[in-house]
Amino acid sequence: MFDFDSYIRLLREDPKTIVLPEGTDPRVIEAASRLLAGNFLQPILIGEEDAVWEAAQEAGYNIRGAKILTPSTYEKMDEMVEQFCEIRAKKGMTQEKAREILKDPNYFGTMLIKMGEYDSLLGGVMHSVIDTIKPALEIIGTKEGNNLVSSCIGLVRPRAT
């Protein structure tokens, strides 16, 4: 059985970052708030900053301390576009098309991981599995010699009383 407490202890010793592309969804905001309170993963929310703060306020969660990134104002967008064009060069990617694609939070978030800016990404609350996995396959790909991809869904249900 997985020892969740040991995992949390390891994360607290060496905190990591997690990109959350669906930054305005109340469930994602709740998760970010819990991560901040638990002090073991630093959430990076993607979305228009005002919209993320408004959603957090409406949902009643404190996300102070979370980083919020907006694709349209990201300071390293030119570098990101260049790298994305290099990765997708065989598919005829242009800078104009890359800028449009990178407005999508799943593509933007995946490029943040590819560029080494952050450690991990978790998505799929508002988007389908394919919309979440496709950017990872196109940008990061699979391990050499491995062509199998899998996803995982975790469900938490209340304990019976």
What are these regions (language model features)?
Residues M1-T161:
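Anion-binding alpha/beta catalytic cores of soluble intermediary-metabolism enzymes, centered on
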